[in-house]
Amino acid sequence: MAVDITLLFRASVKTVKTRNKALGVAVGGGADGSRDELFRRSPRPKGDFSSRAREVISHIGKLRDFLLEHRKEYINAYSHTMSEYGRMTDTERDQIDQDAQIFMRTCKDAIQQLRTEAHKEIHSQQVKEHRTAVLDFVEDYLKRVCKLYSEQRAIRVKRVVDKKRLSKLEPEPHTKRKEPASEKSSHNASQDSEEKPAAEDLPEKPLAESQPELGTWGDGKGEDELSPEEIQMFEQENQRLIGEMNSLFDEVRQIEGKVVEISRLQEIFTEKVLQQETEIDSIHQLVVGATENIKEGNEDIREAIKNNAGFRVWILFFLVMCSFSLLFLDWYDS
């Protein structure tokens, strides 16, 4: 009859644990430790495809983080007026454009190389589908980063155009007129400073002698009044300036529309290029399959030709034997 010794076994395990704990031995060798050892899985050897795919994803993520980190400095075209984000020059922005385009092209070539190698290697259908899904995900991630870069570049170009438009609309003649006025005021101030000691030396100078000078300043109000010819001339000038500003605004609107259209076409072009790469890969696979089928067909044709040749030989041998048999029978009868 079987005896239940479960309680005895548990007491023994507890005694062993207590003894090991008292002696300072790690408890990993007990029941829990053995269970952990049983359920502990050895790490899977990572393949070259997985490591390279993760490397490409890491590079694309670094490019995305870089673009988002320097977004405000990159798209800001008024670096000379704003001190908060005005830390990047146009040369640095152009360098970022060049490096980003090279980086995206390199990532695209790496994805293409991975796709080619994945199709060349012999694996099960499940592994092929998994790798195709991974490459599609990486390619979609690269498309999103390219779209982010295209949007930032379109915003930058738009702001550069706005900046040029504002620089054209600045009142340059007004600044030129201020210089003679300042020179005139400084010249008048120097004349006043030179005439002041003379006035102190001659306090009894009659008022009538200084009246002509005051008259020239008092007549300034009359000089401000414009004649009808001058008013008409200024109105014509205003109409001409308004027409120029309207034409400039129309040109700016056209340029903005063209910039937006260019960015949209660039995005479509990028998507079409990636789509064409996928189609080229599929066509390549079809061509490879067709080549293999043609090879198999040629081998079948060779075998059929060999079989037909053997069949003809047997027929010829049969006819020859029949002919000799008839000749022998004819000779025998005669």
UniProtKB/Swiss-Prot annotation:
Transmembrane segments: 309-329
Keyword Secreted belongs to the record: no
Main location: endoplasmic reticulum
Start and end residues of each stretch annotated as Disordered: 29-50, 166-225
UniProt-listed CDD domains: SNARE_syntaxin18
One of the GO biological process terms: regulation of Golgi organization
Membrane topology: Single-pass type IV membrane protein
Protein keywords: Coiled coil, Endoplasmic reticulum, ER-Golgi transport, Golgi apparatus, Membrane, Protein transport, Transmembrane, Transmembrane helix, Transport
Claim: Manganese is one of the keywords in the record: no
Pfam family, one: Syntaxin-18_N
Ranges where the t-SNARE coiled-coil homology domain occurs: 242-304
MF-aspect GO terms: protein domain specific binding; SNAP receptor activity
Biased composition range(s): Basic and acidic residues: 33-50, 166-186, 193-207
PANTHER family, per database record: SYNTAXIN-18
Family designation: Belongs to the syntaxin family.
Annotated function: Syntaxin that may be involved in targeting and fusion of Golgi-derived retrograde transport vesicles with the ER.
Assembly behavior: Component of a SNARE complex consisting of STX18, USE1L, BNIP1/SEC20L, and SEC22B. RINT1/TIP20L and ZW10 are associated with the complex through interaction with BNIP1/SEC20L. Interacts directly with USE1L and BNIP1/SEC20L.
Protein name: Syntaxin-18
